[in-house]
Structures are given as structure tokens and as C-alpha cells.
Amino acid sequence: FALLVTQTGNARATIEVMATPQVLILQHVPWERPGRILSNLEDIGLETVTMNIVDKKKPDLPDFGELAGVVIMGGPMGALDYDKYPGLKAEAKLARAAVASGKPILGVCLGHQIIATALGAQLRKGDAPEIGFAPIKRVDKHDFFSMWDKQLTVLHWHNDVVGLPAEGQLLSRSSSTKVQAFRLGSALGMQFHLEVCGSLLDEWLDEPSMVKDLKAAGGSKSQLREQFAQYDQLLQPLAEQVFSGFAARCNSYAQTLNK
């Protein structure tokens, strides 16, 4: 709530005004932006606030009760690196609170791992980095993630892998990563990157640390651009379904806050 002070003559009145619900986007590095997620939130008129709290032990977050939803983006750190990045602990606490209250929450890559570990899943190093385009297989369907094709080739960029939280619904997997997407309550986690559009990919490939990872995994900038051009059109329907659905859930949740 915000306080609005009005004055008529010598009389002053203080009125409690409901703040506009926002979707909180937690970003860990400048180039891991929300891309298509943000576009879908803006398309239906939702306000967003983007913060990077990884280095803050006690981050000054917006009032949780006034949030319409939460997005946790990717980054190069480990989901449990609390000593080096104390803000990740606050993000895990936020994830648990969102699920407990039914508030929509979406995690991508590191965000997927933060949500899963916050809900009790185990984190470990993958057998090898999964970087570039590779297929995922559908395991189950849900309105949050309606992958109609049995297999899709998506963009990956991670070293760690996470298990499935108890009571979580496994939605997709790959040959090297058993949990590529899952749902638990109001949470959706995706290990891969549906949010990346062409301009965001260019930002990734301008970032030296990303290029270093790509080359170490045997890839190249030209190859990745060619693969993006090949697969992106096939991925757009799923990206639209996932992110417009998340935006709609945030919008519905915002309406409950305004009552």
C-alpha cells in the first residue's frame, strides 16, 4: 500500500492507496535478460521491476504481497552458491513463498535450478556442459507447458543439473538432463532457453564469457546463429504458449490483489 496525503483548506487526510501490482524479474547478469518473457508481460499491460540482488545478503525487495508474479532468470553462478552470492538465498526463500501462496513463478536455467532446490531437489554437476541446440523429449503435458510435439530442439546453456522436487510434475527431459522442465503448484521451471530472440542471442554472442563457454563445448558463433535460424520458428509456438500463459496467470493474480 502507498499513503496519499490530501489537503483541503486546513484539513489534511491520509488515504491508503493500493500500489499497482508488479511482476518481479530477478536478473543475475546483464546479458541474461527476460526477452520474450518480458514482451508477453508488457503485451497485456503488466508492470515489471527488474532487480539484481545476487550480491546482497539482505536485499531490499518489493513488498511480496503486492507482487503479481516472479521471474528468476539464468546466470553463470551455481544455485546453491550462497557464500559467494548471498542474494541467491533470498531468491530461494522467495520461490518457496511464491509456491506456498499460489503466486505465479517462472524459472529459466539457473532460475529453474533455484526454484527446484528451494523446493527440496538435489543439485549436481552435469556429466558434461549442455550448450547449444539439442533435443528435449516430452514426458507429460500441463497447461503451463503444452509441448505437443514428442521432441523439440531447443537452446541449452548449463553445466549443473537438478533433480525433480517431491510432488513435482516432470514435463520434459533430454538424453543428458533428466529434468528439463517441471511444474509444482504455481511454479514452472525450464532448464533451456525459450526466451531468447534474435537480438538477445546477439547480446549473448557479444559477451566474451558466453563465447568462451560455447567454444569450450565445441561450438562456434556462426554455427549457433545458423541453428537459431533453423529452429527458432519451430520453437515460437511453444514460447508463445508458455510465456503468454504465464503472463495471463500473473494478470489474474494481480486482479485478486486489487480486490
Language model segments and positions:
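Short, positively charged and aromatic/hydrophobic N-terminal segments
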Residues: 3, 13-14
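Extreme N-terminal starter segment of soluble prokaryotic enzymes
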Residues: 19-24
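N-terminal, positively charged, Ser/Thr/Ala/Gly-biased leader segments
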Residues: 25-30
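Short N-terminal binding/cap micro-motifs at the start of the first secondary-structure element
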Residues: 32-36
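Flexible gly/pro-rich beta->alpha loop and the following alpha-helix that scaffold active-site loops
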Residues: 38-106
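Catalytic nucleophile loop
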Residues: 98-122
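Pocket-forming structural segment of enzyme catalytic cores
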Residues: 119-200
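Acyltransferase
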Residues: 196-259
